[in-house]
Amino acid sequence: MFITFEGIDGSGKTTQSRLLTEYLSGVYGVDNVILTREPGGTFFNESVRNLLFSTKNLDKLSELLFFIAMRREHFMKVIKPALTQQKIVICDRFIDSTIAYQGYGHGIDCKLIEELNDLVVDIYPNITFVLDSDINQSVARSNKNGYEFLDLEFYARVRDGFRDIVKRNQYRCYLITNVDATKNINEISAIYLKTIKILHAL
């Protein structure tokens, strides 16, 4: 099973992906559940991630191509081998973040991004949880964690992008609305577990 968490920076998806990993590891064993993230997930990718996030004014198409190349490396080295071994993979960000951020946020053609994604991966998530949180709360939380601040209009476009992605992919995407990531951690986790149990009889 392949589960992804999506949302704007500071939405709480990293916390929720970790909590779900801990729960499923208790059920299926730590060796059968993999928690990973994008951009990153391999030693090489983590090094490139640090370089990208410390580089200012990088051309947006160049940035996209870096992300796509990193996704291929991550998919072939981590995600696909784990799924082939029947493990549960939980990923903090995947293809939808690229569409929301680079497409809706930065204005790159979403069709181009989708075609590039199709070029580098051939397995897609079974379940994607999209955390839809208040932009001001999320940005404040993101800044506290040391992430680069982008203007509120940018995050509004990204948020709209995630909502559109959910509408177009209702077979796998679930929008978790009105998220206050600082207060409802256990309540939100229960929603994920209930959804997964219903869909896959875990």
Swiss-Prot record:
GO molecular function, one term: dTMP kinase activity
Enzyme class: transferase
Organism per entry: Ehrlichia ruminantium (strain Gardel)
Single Gene Ontology BP annotation: dTDP biosynthetic process
SUPFAM superfamilies xref list: P-loop containing nucleoside triphosphate hydrolases
Positions in coiled-coil regions: none
Annotated residues for binding of ATP: G7, I8, D9, G10, S11, G12, K13, T14
The EC number(s) this enzyme carries: 2.7.4.9
One Gene Ontology cellular component annotation held by this UniProt entry: cytosol
Record keywords, A-Z: ATP-binding, Kinase, Nucleotide biosynthesis, Nucleotide-binding, Transferase
Catalytic reaction(s) noted: dTMP + ATP = dTDP + ADP
Entry protein name: Thymidylate kinase
Summary of the function given for this chain in its UniProt record: Phosphorylation of dTMP to form dTDP in both de novo and salvage pathways of dTTP synthesis.
Family that this chain belongs to: Belongs to the thymidylate kinase family.
